[in-house]
């Protein structure tokens, strides 16, 4: 039995752990595990994270998602996120951000590739930064994203309003900063895209 499972059984009263065992076993993994279980989901634990099966999903097959717990004050580290995305498995990669009240907010993260587009007649980019050179070369219109609290807003040929907001990830940013960005993006119906070491990640709020 995994520590997370033992703590959850203790919480439900199935058996009792000692105070020392509780202190030893408590972790961010447990906080997210307990939250998912309380939502009625089937959760399995492995060394990568928490494998979650959507309701009515057969548990003998592929998990619906892998959930990676993150503390809201942690500085951002994408190592295990990229590791999961690069596996190419047919499951969502999610993070569960834990706040100071031990509540959890969930986000789905996807690797993103930009397809070719073109500028609308009479439109132009006002940004020429190296961070978005790829997008400019592919025909996207790039303008400042300051009014949305991000670095850039991005238009393709089909859009009258910017579908994407790009934020460049630099040292010192934590997961609370990301949660703020996604909240703003959700409120104005835009997808937040994180630019990190010449890679692109879209991030959206999700209800488990």
Feature names for model-found ranges:
Residues 146:
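Phosphate-end processing signature that detects enzymes handling 5′-triphosphorylated RNA
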Residues 1-143, 158-208:
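Conserved phosphate-interacting/catalytic interface
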């Amino acid at each position: 039995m995994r520590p997370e499972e033992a703590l959850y059984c203790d919480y439900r009263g199935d058996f009792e752990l000692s105070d020392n065992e509780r202190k030893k076993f408590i972790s961010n993994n447990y906080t997210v595990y307990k939250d998912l279980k309380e939502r009625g989901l089937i959760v399995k634990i492995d060394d990568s994270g928490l494998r979650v099966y959507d309701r009515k999903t057969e548990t003998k097959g592929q998990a619906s998602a892998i959930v990676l717990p993150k503390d809201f004050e942690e500085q951002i580290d994408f190592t295990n996120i990229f590791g999961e995305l690069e596996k190419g498995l047919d499951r969502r990669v999610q993070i569960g951000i834990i706040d100071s009240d031990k509540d959890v907010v969930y986000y789905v993260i996807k690797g993103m590739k930009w397809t070719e587009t073109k500028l609308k007649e009479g439109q132009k980019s006002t940004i020429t930064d190296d961070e978005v050179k790829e997008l400019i070369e592919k025909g996207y219109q790039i303008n400042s994203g300051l009014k949305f609290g991000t670095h850039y807003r991005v238009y393709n040929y089909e859009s009258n309003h910017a579908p994407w907001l790009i934020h460049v990830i630099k040292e010192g940013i934590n997961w609370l900063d990301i949660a703020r960005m996604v909240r703003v993006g959700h409120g104005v119906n835009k997808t937040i895209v994180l630019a990190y070491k010449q890679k692109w990640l879209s991030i959206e709020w999700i209800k488990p």
